């Protein structure tokens, strides 16, 4: 399923939160691109994606 960490519908931005390490960050971007594609198909427009690390 798809479970982005946070979605801001007012700015069309999808956020994913991942630990600061290369493997997790790579996985985060992969998820974000998938979410972006799905959101653009479902809701239209251009969606921004942001990977936040901790």
Feature roles, as predicted:
Residues 1-54:
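Catalytic toxin/effector domains delivered as secreted proteins or via bacterial secretion systems
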């Amino acid at each position: 399923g798809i479970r982005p960490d946070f979605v801001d519908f007012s700015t069309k931005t999808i956020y994913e939160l991942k630990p600061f390490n290369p493997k997790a960050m790579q996985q985060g971007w992969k998820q974000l691109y998938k979410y972006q594609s799905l959101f653009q198909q479902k809701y239209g427009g251009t969606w921004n994606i942001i990977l936040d690390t901790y």
